[in-house]
Amino acid sequence: MVDRASASTNNQPQTSEWDALTSEKAFWRDFKYLHGTEIFGEAEPADYVYRIRSGAVRTFKLLPDGRRQIGAFHLSGDVFGIENGDIYRFTAEAIVNTSVWIAKRRRIFGDASEENTTKDVLKLIARSLNHAENHLLLLGRQTSLEKVAAFLTEMDQRMGSPGVMILPMNRRDIADYLGLTIETVSRALSLLCCEGILSFRGQHHREIVLRSRSKLAQMAILSDLKLPPS
C-alpha cells in the first residue's frame, strides 16, 4: 500500500507509452522503499500501478507449506502491479533500496476507452505477460544447470551490462525464483565458474563477469554437464 513508502516530489517516467498513459491522466507520486520493505501485499486492493526508477522488486507468494515462490523480478524501467482483478495476486518487496513512480490505476485504466490509451495499456500488459512466459519457459528447463544458465542469460539481456553484471538478488531469491535449493544454485554457479563461463567479484558474489556469453547461452538450451554431488 502507498502509506508504507515515503513520498517526495511528483515526477514522470520517460518512456513513450508510459508518458502517453500518464500525461494529464494519472495522479503521480515518487516513492522510495528501503530494501526488504513491502510495497503491497497479496490480496490487498490493486489500487496502484508502479514503475521502477531505480532498484529492483520481487513479487512472490507464500505457499501453504511455508515456502516462498518468487513469480518475477522487476528491474529499472519495469512496470508492475497491473492486475486483471481488483486485488494483488502477489506480495511485492524491494530487493534493494528502490525508487518508484506510482499512479492510481483507475486514472490510467479509466481512460482505456480512448484508442491511443488502449494501445498503450496493451503494451504494458504485453510486457508483463512476456516476463511471465519467460519464467514458465525457464521453469520448464530439464536440469538445474540449464535453469541457472537461462536465468543469468535473461538477467544479462534485461540489465544490458557490457562488463560486470551486478545482480540485486541473492542466491535465496534465485533459488525461490527457479524452484531450486540454495545449495543447488550455488553448485550450478560454481560449475559455470569452473568451466570458465563466468567469474565472481565482490564479497557476496553478486558481481558476475560473463566471460563467454555464447557458452552460457548454449548451456541454457541444453547442458550435458552434471552438477557435483552435495
Where do the language-model regions lie?
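Short loop/turn motifs at secondary-structure junctions and domain boundaries
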Residues: 22-23, 39-43, 159
